[in-house]
C-alpha cells in the first residue's frame, strides 16, 4: 500500500499540473502563432494521457491476487501500460517530425516572443518538478523477492527477516520459522506474487476493503496450511518491473526537452531576429516572393529599405524539434522493445538457454530435459517450466533441489518441474517423453509442430538425442498398414482357430 500510495500521489500531482499547463499552452500558441508552443502543448496532452494510463495500470498492478479468470492477477498491467505509453510517444515523435518538415518548407515568424519565453520557462519548471518526482524510475535495479514451485512444492526468498511465521496446522505444534528458512513440516512460502488466501483457494487482496479478513493479520496458504503473518510484511518493491513508471518518466523528460526548445527558440528569436516595424518599408528575403523583380526595383529607387533577418533564426525551431525527436526515439525504443518482448514471452536476454539446458542435463540423476520454456512475467520475475526425466522416483526430491539451484544460478526463481521416470529395464539410447500428447492436439500445443524423428537406417547413424512428446506420438502411429488382400487371410485363420469365439479384426 505504501508503494502504491507514493506513486499514486506523484501521478495525481503531476496530472493536475500537466493538464492545467496544457490548456495554457494551447491558448498562448494560438495568440502568438507559435508552432513550437503548439507542438509542446500536444506533447503535454500526451503526458496527460500517459499519466492516466499509468494511474490505471498502477492500480491494477497492485491486484496481484489470483482469480478464476486471471491466475497471475493484474501483475502485467504495468507492462501493458508501458507499451501503450511507448507507442503513443513514438507516434507523437513522428507527428512532431512532420510539423518540423513543414516548417522547413514554409518558415513562420514568431509573434510576441517574450510571452512565449515566459510560458516556456514556467513549463520547464513544471517538468523539472516532474523529473524530481519520477527520477528514481529512470533506470532498473534487481529485485530480490522470488518464489518457486517444484512438482507441487513451493518456497520463497527475499522476505524481510524480522517477522516470524506461525504454523496453524491441525495436529502439529507451533513452529516459528523465519522467512527464507524451512521447518520440519513446512515448505517455504511461494512469494512470486504476494497473496492472501480464502477457504476456496482463491487469493484475496489484503488492501481490498471488501476483504473481510483484512485487519492486523492476514492468512497465507503454505502447502495447504493456513499461516498468519502481519500486514506489514510486504515484498521489496520490484523496481525492475517499473516499466510503466519509466514510461511516465520518459514522457516528462520529453516534455522538458520541448520546454527547453521553446525557451531557446524564444531567446534566440528575441535577440537575433530583426523584424519589420510598422510604417517602414521592409522586405523579408527569408520567404519566397513572387514579386522579386518588383522588390529589386523598389530597392533601387528607395534609399531606406529595411530587410528582416537573419533567415537562419526561422530554421532554428524546426532544427531543434528534429533533435528532440531523435532524443525521444532513442530513449523510447528500449522501453518499447522490452515491454513488447515481455508480452511476447520471449526468453529474457540475460538467460543463456543453451547453457541452462546443458547444466540441467549434467545434473546427476537426470536422463533428459525437454519441453523447457523460460519467459518473463514482469520485471525480474522470470518463470521456467520443464519436463525432467529421472532414473529413480525415490531420489527425485534431491534431484529437484539440485535443479532448483541451477535455475537459481541463472536468475530464474519461479520454476515448475514435471517429473518423468524411466521405465524399469529401459536401456534405449533414445529417451522419449513419457507423457506423449495425442496427435490431434499437436497444433494446439505451445510449440506447434516439430520435425519428424529419423527412422530406419538414418536412425542408426544418428546419435542419441532427446525426442519430444509430439515426435513420439507421431512415430507410434506410423505403423505399416495392411492392404485389403492381406487382411482377408488373417481373418480366415482366426475363424478356423477359434470357432467358438467372435472373430477379431485388427482393423
From Swiss-Prot:
GO terms for molecular function: calcium channel inhibitor activity; metal ion binding; zinc ion transmembrane transporter activity; zinc:proton antiporter activity. InterPro entries: Cation_efflux, Cation_efflux_CTD_sf, Cation_efflux_TMD_sf. The modification Phosphoserine is found at residue 506. GO terms for cellular component: basolateral plasma membrane; cytoplasm; cytoplasmic vesicle membrane; dendrite; endoplasmic reticulum; endoplasmic reticulum membrane; glutamatergic postsynaptic density; Golgi apparatus. It is a multi-pass membrane protein. Keywords: Antiport, Cell membrane, Cytoplasm, Cytoplasmic vesicle, Endoplasmic reticulum, Glycoprotein, Golgi apparatus, Ion transport, Membrane, Metal-binding, Nucleus, Phosphoprotein, Repeat, Transmembrane, Transmembrane helix, Transport, Zinc, Zinc transport. Pfam families: Cation_efflux (PF01545). Gene3D superfamilies: Cation efflux protein transmembrane domain. Belongs to the cation diffusion facilitator (CDF) transporter (TC 2.A.4) family. SLC30A subfamily. This is Proton-coupled zinc antiporter SLC30A1. It comes from Homo sapiens.
